[in-house]
Amino acid sequence: MELPMSPNYSFEWMPFAERHYAKTFAKKYKNSWLETRDNIDEVCKRIDRMLDFDRADLIYSVGYYKLVKLDFAVAGTRISPKKSGNRCLLFINEEMRHVQVLIAYSKNDIGPPNETAKWKRVIKAEYKDIAEIFSL
């Protein structure tokens, strides 16, 4: 069964995402990061389809709002997105059909032992309004 095409979502990389971990990817992978970022942008435009086909993980959903984890691989690395340990946290406003890239990070950068607790702390510190929506 083919699903009807839905209009694309608008998206933006939040300044915190740009300044922090994404900057690390840009330095480490140079041109491959540009291609990877373009791929992430394309996924954001079709995030509803990615969720439908389990290509992104829904973490929280409250009303029109969703918090989603997206695994990604850096272009040219030949590692699957899941195995790469690279993730983006996305905030989705379904009413406006808009996606915000909140954080792009490597598990190695955010580190063990509790990755979830660490990204929740970042959300609470940098995105207080979003943290309130999801009671983080």
Residue positions per predicted region:
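Short, surface-exposed coil-to-beta transition loops
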Residues: K82-C88
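Basic, Lys/Arg-enriched alpha-helical interface segments
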Residues: M1-K82, E95-M96, S106-L136
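Active-site beta-strand-loop-beta-strand hairpin of nuclease catalytic cores
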Residues: I92-V101
